[in-house]
Amino acid sequence: MARAVGPERRLLAVYTGGTIGMRSELGVLVPGTGLAAILRTLPMFHDEEHARARGLSEDTLVLPPASRNQRILYTVLECQPLFDSSDMTIAEWVCLAQTIKRHYEQYHGFVVIHGTDTMAFAASMLSFMLENLQKTVILTGAQVPIHALWSDGRENLLGALLMAGQYVIPEVCLFFQNQLFRGNRATKVDARRFAAFCSPNLLPLATVGADITINRELVRKVDGKAGLVVHSSMEQDVGLLRLYPGIPAALVRAFLQPPLKGVVMETFGSGNGPTKPDLLQELRVATERGLVIVNCTHCLQGAVTTDYAAGMAMAGAGVISGFDMTSEAALAKLSYVLGQPGLSLDVRKELLTKDLRGEMTPPSVEERRPSLQGNTLGGGVSWLLSLSGSQEADALRNALVPSLACAAAHAGDVEALQALVELGSDLGLVDFNGQTPLHAAARGGHTEAVTMLLQRGVDVNTRDTDGFSPLLLAVRGRHPGVIGLLREAGASLSTQELEEAGTELCRLAYRADLEGLQVWWQAGADLGQPGYDGHSALHVAEAAGNLAVVAFLQSLEGAVGAQAPCPEVLPGV
């Protein structure tokens, strides 16, 4: 994100229709033409004197000075015909993306004037259609026509023009009621109030008041060398199914029939749905024949998880987690992924679980900490840690060492860890999160760092503030190499960790996740440990018909609870 520079900023304002330009006809609002002519009469949208002096065309307007040395000029491109946004489809949004592509080199940014009813769908669709976007695209509209005495349209449109003209925010955004949202994170939440949109799971990219506040850390970074790519081959045979208590399996079956290729299924709470066998069977049959189903919560905030058995059942039926995506974003993403040519079904499913345009926050994504080597920060830290001779310097160094050691271990930076050792640092100290460097290295799967720390004699069974051991973190991260090193050094799961493993083992068995079961066994867990309902992983696998898992577990029945071998000789099926 950067502040736009230059004496003039040229924008293209694409008017598709919507309430902002509507007029009353026979007592109802219908799309109204001639928006540029209306804006020309409003001094806040057009400096007639400056336009006359510049000899601007009729469709190009100029805002009053936005700053001392900068003017924002904008050309209004009116679609023919105009649309009520309720009539918009993927085809119209593809045309809109292609319009932006045609004019991409002529303008510094783009404002799309769109009806509010489907604006969140439009913003989500455009975010996936426009790849490698390096200019600002903002959708806006109004709840009341702009020519009305009391209208939100004037503030919304002016705010969108100012944001697109003054800042380079290389995303598809939505501006409404003084807030700039990431487009694929926004949803409409009110039919009448001016604060019609919100971004339930991500803070606004910017807020406008007496000052403009940009949340710079949220703005996505782009590759400055990549050119804009417009994806026009969006799959149109996708749908949205909202579950409700008691929904008949026959209704679900009817909905999931061809030619449907993908479904966003809105579920209860954190991704839960009815666990009736006939309904789960319909979902399983559909996913096994290649239908892609994405699970999104119908709650406004929060994410889909498998904390509950009902959510686990959805995953077991082949339904893909939508994490914290809005339904609008999930539908757009599904359309985009299924529309890409030449991809296997497995690759498409994998793409749906990845963050492609900032549309979701996968729970596996952890904060990345930079390496302490090879950068300016590393040089400054090395200098700071080498300070001695004063009480203040020693106190500062001692306070920083635990966090720096954990950062180095998390990055797998053995050289930085060795540098800390040479300065006399204790690599067994805990950081502000209550974790040791061994926790950080185990979580990241860094075998070299783990080896180095074990050679330094750190406590292999140390617990963090949550009671987690490095071994448990390695199991959760599925790092068999690290698990083997820790086990050889005497690591073991605690009684609490083993007791809580039962439910997780059942979840893995239900999902036919052999890799997950193997790392637990390698860590010394009893795979016969029952879950919260008293059933074991073997019982769950048998009930789910996961024969490979059943065979694996039965092969271990004679050695349940025994010491697991090293990772090189894990049992297979």
From Swiss-Prot:
Residues 41-350 are annotated as: Asparaginase. It is an enzyme of class 3 (hydrolase). One of its GO terms (cellular component) is cytosol. GO terms for molecular function: 1-alkyl-2-acetylglycerophosphocholine esterase activity; acyltransferase activity, transferring groups other than amino-acyl groups; asparaginase activity; lysophospholipase activity. CDD domains: L-asparaginase_I. The keyword Magnesium does not apply. SUPFAM superfamilies: Ankyrin repeat, Glutaminase/Asparaginase. Gene3D superfamilies: 3.40.50.40, Ankyrin repeat-containing domain, L-asparaginase, N-terminal domain. One of its GO terms (biological process) is lipid catabolic process. Keywords: Acyltransferase, ANK repeat, Hydrolase, Lipid degradation, Lipid metabolism, Repeat, Transferase. Substrate binds at D84, S85, S86, T116, D117. It catalyses: a 1-acyl-sn-glycero-3-phosphocholine + H2O = sn-glycerol 3-phosphocholine + a fatty acid + H(+); L-asparagine + H2O = L-aspartate + NH4(+); a 1-O-alkyl-2-acetyl-sn-glycero-3-phosphocholine + H2O = a 1-O-alkyl-sn-glycero-3-phosphocholine + acetate + H(+); 1-hexadecanoyl-sn-glycero-3-phosphocholine + H2O = sn-glycerol 3-phosphocholine + hexadecanoate + H(+). Monomer. PANTHER family: 60 KDA LYSOPHOSPHOLIPASE (PTHR11707:SF28), L-ASPARAGINASE (PTHR11707). In the N-terminal section; belongs to the asparaginase 1 family. NCBIfam families: asnASE_I. This is 60 kDa lysophospholipase.
